[in-house]
Amino acid sequence: MPENYTPAAAATGTWTEEEIRHQPRAWIRSLTNIDALHSALNNFLEPLLRKENLRIILTGAGTSAFIGDIIAPWLASHTGKNFSAVPTTDLVTNPMDYLNPAHPLLLISFGRSGNSPESVAAVELANQFVPECYHLPITCNEAGALYQNAINSDNAFAVLMPAETHDRGFAMTSSITTMMASCLAVFAPETINSQTFRDVADRCQAILTSLGDFSEGVFGYAPWKRIVYLGSGGLQGAARESALKVLELTAGKLAAFYDSPTGFRHGPKSLVDNETLVVVFVSSHPYTRQYDLDLLAELHRDNQAMRVIAIAAESSDIVAAGPHIILPPSRHFIDVEQAFCFLMYAQTFALMQSLHMGNTPDTPSASGTVNRVVQGVIIHPWQA
């Protein structure tokens, strides 16, 4: 670890805060490294991407799985390639449903430690099921099994994140966002690279700076018992990750949910009461934004939630009608870029809510039944 990697300067004295704060710097470091790997990556990927029937699966467990939820929709539309997101936890239990031997496969495995039992098993199962299988692990741990196995394999190319993104805190913060940015830079280098992404890093740094020492919270403090994050398209993945952060860092003391704004009406809205905080991630796409704002206006009219907060790049009459956060000024961001901004608020909220509720964010599970690297998983051998 770098010598200056210490939580001493963090107001809360936690690794989690330090790891939230260093994200913008870590992204640029990682994308600079990927720029330098461009030729080697091309040599590995170009022959694969020319295969018309290539499947590209983004996989991981927990937070690492949500990376795919956030970025796969944009990567698929931007590149025209067959990107999909499937958690390792599904690949391992139901490999026959996801691993088609008739199609070549590129498995992109995300992992902070690279040692999750399901992540290691998913790679082995993919090799077992798919005759023409390739691997691109993106991981934060040089000593982890994902990285070590890949560098010794002929069908793999490993991409290593900066050491400081191997988060020491319980919850994944800088690890998820750096792996996200890095995967985008691998497959869309003309759009996402160390130069273009500085706008995202600068905007996110402005968000973190605006929150000061974090003591005032992000959405204030109130005796809410539930929080719901809502986002459309890939932003539903960001909403899912945001909900998990709260659940993890408060050890379940604050119940957390996620959905899309349109999906929320179909039953899940039943959970909204006067102890519920609802946060809406408003899309930057003019078409999608209409649906987000429709639901936001509906929640204002319902007047059932304790608080409904919109986070958006720009204001509107509907946004301004209730509590809201407008992102610091910048160029127009597509939603996959805006997701990084939304996660800054969500991570910080989870950290401060954890402390506010008497938890220790770096080790929130007092019972020890939930671990930083998952334990207790039995991997059963596949028998055809």
Curated annotation (Swiss-Prot):
| Disulfide bonds listed in the record | none
- Provide GO CC annotations from the record: plasma membrane
- Give a GO molecular function annotation for the protein: hydrolase activity
SUPFAM superfamilies found in the cross-reference section: SIS domain
Ranges for domain SIS come to 45-197, 215-364
What does induction of this protein depend on?
Induced by growth on N-acetyl-D-galactosamine.
Phenotype when the gene is knocked out: Deletion mutant does not grow on N-acetyl-D-galactosamine.
**EC number, as in UniProt:** 3.5.99.-
Q: Report keywords, A-Z.
A: Carbohydrate metabolism, Hydrolase, Repeat
Q: Which PROSITE patterns match?
A: SIS
- BP GO annotations: carbohydrate derivative metabolic process; phosphoenolpyruvate-dependent sugar phosphotransferase system
Segments crossing the lipid bilayer: none
Per its record, the protein catalyses: D-galactosamine 6-phosphate + H2O = D-tagatopyranose 1-phosphate + NH4(+)
The record's section on PANTHER family has:
D-GALACTOSAMINE-6-PHOSPHATE DEAMINASE AGAS-RELATED, N-ACETYLGALACTOSAMINE PERMEASE II COMPONENT-RELATED
- Role of this protein: Catalyzes the isomerization-deamination of galactosamine 6-phosphate to form tagatofuranose 6-phosphate and ammonium ion.
Identify its protein family.
Answer: Belongs to the SIS family. AgaS subfamily.
Q: What is this protein called?
A: D-galactosamine-6-phosphate deaminase AgaS
